[in-house]
Amino acid sequence: YRRQRQMCIRDRDYNSHLGTKRGGLATYSEERGFIRSIHNLESTYFRTKFEDELDKFKGNAGIGIISDTDAQPIIINSHLGRFAIVTVAKITNIKELEDELLSQNMHFAELSSSNTNQTELIALLIIQGKTFVEGIENVFKHIKGSCSMLLLTEDGSIIAARDQWGRTPVVIGKKEDAYAATSESSSFPNLDYEIDRYLGPGEIVRLYSDHVVQLRKPGEGMQICSFLWVYYGCLLYTSPSPRD
């Protein structure tokens, strides 16, 4: 989201439905740069872990995630600039991609339960591109599985990208002076956001405080995870109907 820091933290607390193990937040300000915090949530609730840290978060843009897989956000310094990234991903060829990146003299600094952190792997694929869009398209090209993501950049904007087959949702919400991107629109009514629209498969947008810029148009194919139709219990998409 792009909003005051208290709003970033409070808003994030309404989006903890699809994960239970780890929670992470990252904000950006010109004064202090990126600030990140990650906690284990297996024995407690999201709010109790982060409420004592509110004062350390600065800036009016932030991203966060509740994950059952990787410790995230990951913060990367690259030729594209510094950025923080969170992903909702399931990569079936992760070992193959790991070996390929290691053969290119890449290295992995973040491990999750002694395994490669797939969010870091995705970030390494992104920085192989000349731009963020080219890098995200590189992710789509190489992974087998699915990946939706949010990137928080040094200009305070947020890049949102939906999985190229639309398997997991990304919805944009708006209010008077803020935009938000999330996987679950159920949080918006409590926070006075209105649904702006759902991203299409493979669509990439950039969120600012007062507008959204489309960076990549959506594709034609849609292979939504059928579980989500039951999980959310509502009509989620106005884009093309699911198909095999």
Model-flagged regions — what are they?
Residues 2-6, 10-200, 206-239:
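Conserved short alpha-helical segments that host acidic/polar catalytic motifs at enzyme active sites
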Residues 240-244:
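A short, hydrophobic C-terminal helix/tail in secreted or cell-surface proteins
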